[in-house]
């Protein structure tokens, strides 16, 4: 590992352990400069076994401290070519990937995958989101812009790109807490069907819609998108706001086929916003497990732009035509930075003494985060990755250092995990390793797009 760090070309990393300090790279260049303090020898075990995922879990466990998490991510991305040479055990990596396939987004699995993230408790999301409860990339305008204004700007952009009209019936595909549905009705008077698989989101969305007096225009359903019957529903517009990341690579054609069947055959418009993986790394990413799809979004998949377009072409048999594409990674980096600041500022005040509404989900997270990984049937159910990798004892549960239990409140490991999640994604978007892409699809003979709102 140290030999690999010696080959880094951008920025520097200083590592301290038990008073010993060593620096790698060039502290004088303009790249990120990272300082790590190793607090437990278990850090090295995790790092050598599962590399960047091991680092994330060591941070969750309190086995390492970092002066700047975002700069750490930037350092890793800039030096990925050399750092990946110190790759994780191929046996471990293969087993990790096989184990992750149990989170595949079949109809049976998808509801539990969604619940594992979005049903952690509305009070947690309320703490870092703005009053619109919009959990997606905002579109910013100047350094003094507020999160709420930036989120409304994003919602307006999607509504305008879809050319939503008062007479339209709109599908809000993955409606969250209802902000897009409500904004569309507020601006145009259209009718909206919002669908979600999160019971927590549905409850809050319906409350907010009723309070706004929009219940006659908006319906929220707890349903998988694949179960909407095209014989019963025909939508003029479909807007999918950062939902396709929960679909899974193998289901992209199925997703677009269903959208094609639900969308009006002539004047239909579909607008999609998604985080998108760099094309260069996409094949490798598809066959690996990372921090996000293990600890944050089980079953999650960050598609590439070409995978989305190919899925749309295959699923619709060429009848969903790509109209436009735009990328906003810098806007997502700023959004994540603001979320992280709000999360950390409010955690001790809001969450540390609040019992999660669904504590069992956090208990399940402990099983995922601990040293005992759940392996597929081809491996012993009692084996840990450490035992498989080098025959030593199992890694300690990252939750053993927690000061509180899930029953008592959101614990400090939960806090470090979400802090790492925000910083990890911010660094990836800031370096454009990940994009935030808006795609517009329409029908070949759709003349409605001459609307001047669309021609911006």
Name these PLM-found stretches.
Residues 166-174:
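Conserved class I S-adenosyl-L-methionine
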Residues 1-151, 157:
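Feature captures hydrophobic
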Residues 253-267:
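A short glycine-rich, Lys/Arg-flanked "PGG" loop and its adjoining helix->strand segment in the class I
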């Amino acid at each position: 590992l140290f030999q690999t760090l010696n080959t880094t070309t951008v920025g520097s990393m200083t590592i301290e352990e038990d008073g010993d300090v060593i620096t790698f790279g060039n502290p004088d260049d303009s790249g990120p400069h990272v300082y790590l303090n190793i607090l437990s020898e278990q850090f090295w075990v995790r790092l050598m076994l599962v590399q960047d995922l091991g680092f994330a879990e060591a941070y969750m466990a309190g086995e390492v401290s970092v002066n700047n998490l975002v700069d750490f991510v930037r350092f890793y991305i800039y030096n990925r070519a050399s750092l990946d040479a110190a790759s994780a055990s191929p046996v471990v990596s293969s087993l990790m990937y096989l184990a992750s396939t149990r989170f595949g987004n079949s109809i049976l699995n998808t509801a539990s995958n969604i619940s594992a993230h979005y049903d952690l408790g509305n009070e947690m999301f309320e703490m870092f989101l703005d009053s619109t409860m919009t959990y997606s990339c905002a579109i910013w305008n100047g350094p003094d812009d507020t999160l709420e204004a930036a989120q409304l700007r994003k919602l307006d952009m999607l509504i305008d790109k879809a050319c939503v009209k008062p007479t339209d019936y709109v599908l809000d595909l993955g409606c969250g807490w209802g902000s897009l549905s409500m904004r569309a009705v507020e601006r145009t008077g259209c009718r909206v069907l919002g669908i979600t698989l999160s019971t927590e989101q549905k409850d809050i969305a319906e409350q907010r819609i009723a309070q706004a007096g929009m219940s006659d225009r908006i319906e929220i359903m707890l349903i998988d998108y694949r179960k909407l019957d095209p014989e019963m529903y025909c939508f003029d517009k479909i807007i999918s706001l950062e939902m396709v990341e929960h679909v899974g690579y193998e289901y992209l054609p199925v997703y677009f086929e269903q959208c094609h069947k639900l969308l009006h055959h002539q004047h239909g418009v579909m607008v999609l916003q998604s985080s998108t993986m760099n094309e260069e790394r996409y094949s490798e990413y598809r066959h690996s497990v990372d921090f996000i799809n293990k600890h944050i979004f089980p079953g999650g998949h960050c598609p590439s732009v070409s995978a989305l377009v190919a899925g749309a072409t295959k699923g619709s048999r060429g009848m969903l035509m790509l109209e436009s594409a735009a990328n906003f990674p810098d806007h997502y980096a700023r959004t994540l930075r603001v979320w992280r600041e709000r999360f950390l500022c409010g955690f001790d005040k809001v969450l540390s003494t609040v019992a999660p509404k669904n504590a069992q989900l956090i208990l399940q997270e402990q099983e995922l985060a601990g040293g005992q990984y759940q392996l597929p049937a081809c491996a012993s159910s009692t084996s840990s990755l450490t035992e498989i990798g080098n025959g030593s004892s199992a890694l300690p549960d990252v939750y053993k250092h927690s000061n509180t239990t899930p029953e008592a409140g959101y614990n400090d490991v939960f806090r470090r995990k979400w802090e790492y999640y925000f910083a990890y994604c911010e660094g990836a978007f800031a370096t454009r390793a990940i994009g935030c892409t808006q795609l517009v699809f329409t029908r070949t003979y759709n003349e409605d797009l001459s609307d001047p709102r669309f021609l911006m």
